[in-house]
């Protein structure tokens, strides 16, 4: 998703 969190 955001790039700086471990999510797409």
From Swiss-Prot:
Keywords: Toxin. The keyword Transmembrane helix does not apply. There is a cross-link at residues 1-8 (Cyclopeptide (Met-Pro)). GO terms for molecular function: toxin activity. The keyword Amino-acid biosynthesis does not apply. Processed by the macrocyclase-peptidase enzyme POPB to yield a cyclic octapeptide. POPB first removes 10 residues from the N-terminus. Conformational trapping of the remaining peptide forces the enzyme to release this intermediate rather than proceed to macrocyclization. The enzyme rebinds the remaining peptide in a different conformation and catalyzes macrocyclization of the N-terminal 8 residues. Cyclic octapeptide that belongs to the MSDIN-like toxin family responsible for a large number of food poisoning cases and deaths. Cycloaminide B is non-toxic to mammals but shows immunosuppressive activity, probably through the inhibition of the action of interleukin-1 and interleukin-2. Belongs to the MSDIN fungal toxin family. This is Cycloamanide D. It comes from Amanita phalloides.
